Amino acid sequence: MTGLNSLDLPGRPEDTRVVVAMSGGVDSSVTAALLKEQGYDVVGITLQLYDHGAAVSRKGACCAGQDIQDARRVADQIGIPHYVLDYEDRFRRAVMDDFADSYAAGETPIPCVRCNERVKFRDLLDTARDLGAAALATGHYIASRRGAAGRELHRPRDEERDQSYFLFATTQEQLEFLRFPLGELTKPEARALADRMGLEVAGKPDSQDICFVPTGRYTTIVEKLRPGASAPGEVVHLDGRVLGRHSGIVNFTIGQRRGLGIGASEPVSEPLFVVKLDPLKRQVIVGPREALETQKLTLRDINWLGDGPFAELPGEGLKIVAKVRSTRPPVPARLFRTGEGAVVELLESEGGVAPGQACVFYDGGGGQRVLGGGWIVRTESCWQVPEAGTSRVAAPTAD
């Protein structure tokens, strides 16, 4: 289309207002500075998401007190208005409560996905519209491109910084309003731009932690919000043997090996890993590494960004590549629609896949376009538990 600016929007940059979500880090600061340099009417917004008093001096986490100050200084430096919005209450309800509930249910949550889904790309997007913006821009490393049926989500040029796993829940409506200027840049290029522009945050380290966990110990937050989640229980082997006691399933995640609480009175001949958490029985179930391998995932709450309605997915399934953890590369798979969600069958087994995590879909051709994803509710183990005698039975699934 003709008459579009660099953000794929109609009109001149100076006539186009863009709200930039500024976290105080290098990436969002470069995003704001680039758009300002290109002539856009830029407004910076920073969200205060959790207790400001507890976070003022903490560094290395998104939206901490120091980060709010950094965002304000960058906005002043590049000459744009900047606002801080107090979203503590809605963040608590939408993200922190879900985080605690997930751990109490024996899941391993991804709070960054929930934050993008329920706060940044919903409430902040509405605020941007209220301010008369034509788009909300962020510093995420992901690409948004015009497709035949609307905007599409694609993996970024810098695959080492690929954040598509955390943005799979972005809806089509949100995608039409969002822009990701760093999608075609690498992280070193973004830092070089920050240096060239003289931004104060050019050398600031990347955020690493969950923003609302001040000590890095997530169990502290879970126990505070859901005290009953720390109820003790048994550590049980897949073969039924009780090997020890634990002080609460919130202290464990799928794939964990250390700190299992197995007593010396129950010697084991092989390394054991957490393969399932049963919140109803308050059991931590352990087994060999092989029991962590899975090729079949059951998903709920599907967000579909592919062509055509998800309900019209072919009965023989759709060839895709799937990503089951943020740190793992996508693997070939097949996607099947079910009455309540979807099933993904992996062509290669993956280990340590936990309920509560996401399975993200990419196109089966080049694996670059994001087709959506869903939340893992159950995995089916590839391993079988040897019984006494010669028969073998399937290991229980993690759910």
From Swiss-Prot:
Site, Interaction with tRNA: residue positions: 140, 357
Signal peptide location: none
GO cellular component: cytoplasm
Database matches in InterPro entries: MnmA-like, MnmA-like_C, MnmA-like_central, MnmA-like_central_sf, Rossmann-like_a/b/a_fold
Any single Pfam family the record assigns to this protein: tRNA_Me_trans_C
Region (Interaction with tRNA): 161-163
Molecular function per GO: ATP binding; tRNA binding; tRNA-uridine 2-sulfurtransferase activity
EC class name: transferase
NCBIfam families, alphabetized: PRK00143.1 (NF001138), trmU (TIGR00420)
Protein name, as recorded: tRNA-specific 2-thiouridylase MnmA
Organism: Parvibaculum lavamentivorans (strain DS-1 / DSM 13023 / NCIMB 13966)
Organism placement in taxonomy: Bacteria, Pseudomonadati, Pseudomonadota, Alphaproteobacteria, Hyphomicrobiales
